[in-house]
Amino acid sequence: MLTILKTGQSAHKVPPEKVQATYGRYRIQALLSVFLGYLAYYIVRNNFTLSTPYLKEQLDLSATQIGLLSSCMLIAYGISKGVMSSLADKASPKVFMACGLVLCAIVNVGLGFSSAFWIFAALVVFNGLFQGMGVGPSFITIANWFPRRERGRVGAFWNISHNVGGGIVAPIVGAAFAILGSEHWQSASYIVPACVAVIF
């Protein structure tokens, strides 16, 4: 495991009288971090679906090729969730999750400059693999900060990030198309969502 991904040591000791308040504040911060982080993962995953009409019109890809691209990403993502979650156990969840999101954004920028089918296929596979770096750290963070009796409620709240992230992709891409125009469909579909996801 790379040193940068390892969990760091605590930088300072908290005075006993402030432990309870500090703990409460930190665990809310931890929950919001994984909520917003996983929300951002969806921005650079579901944006691909919105680009499919342009893949057909502008790059002359067939429905079969587009379906294959979607399948490649989802299969890679499914495999990656198991592998990456195991690796996340040995890493700092915060750093691991952030690295995965940045890598997904980089792949999306690559999609914004690609036109060949096999390059697209390779990039969507990489996107699927890096997408798997989001779920493990989220579960680990929730388990580390919340007792078993609270995890159902906390997990339900975190799960909303899937819907919020998936729901805001269309407005983001739509606004990008309105500003940039359909001639810049790759930037609107891939590069703008990548930038928004990293800002999150």
Indicate where each model-derived feature is located:
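Extracytoplasmic
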Residues: 29-63
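Small-residue-rich segments within alpha-helical transmembrane domains of MFS-like 12-TM solute carriers
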Residues: 42, 46, 112, 128-136, ...
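Residue-level signature of mid-helix packing/kink "hotspots" within the transmembrane helices
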Residues: 46, 74-82, 167
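Conserved MFS/SLC helix-loop-helix module at the cytosolic interface between two early adjacent transmembrane helices
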Residues: 79-117
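Short hydrophobic/alpha-helical segments at membrane-entry points of transmembrane helices
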Residues: 116-124
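Cytoplasmic helix-loop-helix junction between adjacent transmembrane helices
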Residues: 123-160
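Helix-loop-helix hairpin linking two adjacent transmembrane segments in secondary transporters
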Residues: 158-200
